[in-house]
Amino acid sequence: MLTVPASATHDDLRSIAGMRGHYRVLIVFTPSFADARLAAQRAIMAQLALKAAERDLLFVQIDPMTVIGASDRADKLRRKFVVPVLNYHAILIDKDGRTLRESHGPMEAGAILRAIDGAASRRIEVKRAHMGKPAVDKG
C-alpha cells in the first residue's frame, strides 16, 4: 500500500486556504510560543471567545517550526505572508481572503471587532440574520 504525506488544500477546512469562505482568521507569527506578545494575544482572544465565535473567527499561532490551529506548515505560511522567522506579526484575514488588519504587536480586542464588523461580508451576515436567513446564501 502506498502512503502519501498529507498536505493542506483549498478543500481542507483545517488549512488557511481551506478556511476561506468559512472563517475569519487571526494569524499570529511569533519567534516563540513563550513570547510575551503572544501571551497577551492569547489573553485577548480568551476575552473575545464568545464574540469571536459569533464572527466565525479562528486563532492560528505560528512559531518558527509549529502551527497551532491550522494544518499548514510554518515555513510555507511564513513565505506566503512574507514574515521573517524572528518577527512577531499578526494578520486578521476576512472570509474572502482579504487582509482586514495587521499589527507588529498584539491586536487589541476593539480593533479586531471593529475591523470585522466594518467588513462588507460581516454587514451582509448581520443583515441576513436580522431577516431570518442563513448567514451565507447557499445558492
Predicted segment positions?
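Non-catalytic interaction/Regulatory regions outside core domains
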Residues: M1-G139
